[in-house]
Amino acid sequence: MKKILLLHMLVFVSATLPISSVASDEVETLKCTIIADAITGNTLYETGECARRVSPCSSFKLPLAIMGFDSGILQSPKSPTWELKPEYNPSPRDRTYKQVYPALWQSDSVVWFSQQLTSRLGVDRFTEYVKKFEYGNQDVSGDSGKHNGLTQSWLMSSLTISPKEQIQFLLRFVAHKLPVSEAAYDMAYATIPQYQAAEGWAVHGKSGSGWLRDNNGKINESRPQGWFVGWAEKNGRQVVFARLEIGKEKSDIPGGSKAREDILVELPVLMGNK
């Protein structure tokens, strides 16, 4: 009886722990897709393990855009334009982006722009927005002992979210039920990248790429993860979707790019049956 009870406890803990708190070699490959009706909230399609939390990575740029426009720090898809400064300490990739405006920030996923936005928001406003949005585990503390939550919490750090929670956030966004201004909705909607899928579907969404961490907390590049989350429209019909993929081998293709291309192919097919 004790063995059975222990087994049930282990299963429960495994199901509720975020992937970032589990060693990367303890997590199998994962692929989740959820599509829900934007009006009713009803799930139209769900497959895979969709309750596990992982880092949102750059898919967090969607809520960041809403925060930026609601706070007035961002004004439109083309304004403001911020110039890169050496003290921003950008990645080698992001050093090529010398001047960035909101639409370019979103389409090209420029990390230093995100970090400058949160720095301008400040800890208190940033934390308040995440809590009001009920976004994932709402933990923006950052890496343990580093006090870097304001600029790092969503980048393979403390903030985690599951595909199911992404859907709940997206449903609130498209229904205008987040505690933000109407202008924030309009500007965020206009800034998020749009893609054309088959069968006349217009897909709006943000990808996010990263990796799991190993037992020592180091990034394990053989465990890529990729998000693509957003909404899609066709002939007055609107759905929200979340796609999460976690692999078991190193890839030259960013995980978010792969998740995006997969959903652009699959969504029209899946919705054709609904």
From Swiss-Prot:
It catalyses: a beta-lactam + H2O = a substituted beta-amino acid. Gene3D superfamilies: DD-peptidase/beta-lactamase superfamily. Substrate binds at residues 206-208. The active site is at residue 58. The modification N6-carboxylysine is found at residue 61. One of its GO terms (molecular function) is penicillin binding. Keywords: Antibiotic resistance, Hydrolase, Plasmid, Signal, Transposable element. It comes from the Bacteria. It is an enzyme of class 3 (hydrolase). Pfam families: Transpeptidase (PF00905). InterPro entries: Beta-lactam/transpept-like, Beta-lactam_class-D_AS, PCN-bd_Tpept. Oxacillin-hydrolyzing beta-lactamase. Confers resistance to beta-lactam antibiotics but at a significantly lower level than the TEM bla gene product. Belongs to the class-D beta-lactamase family. This is Beta-lactamase OXA-9.
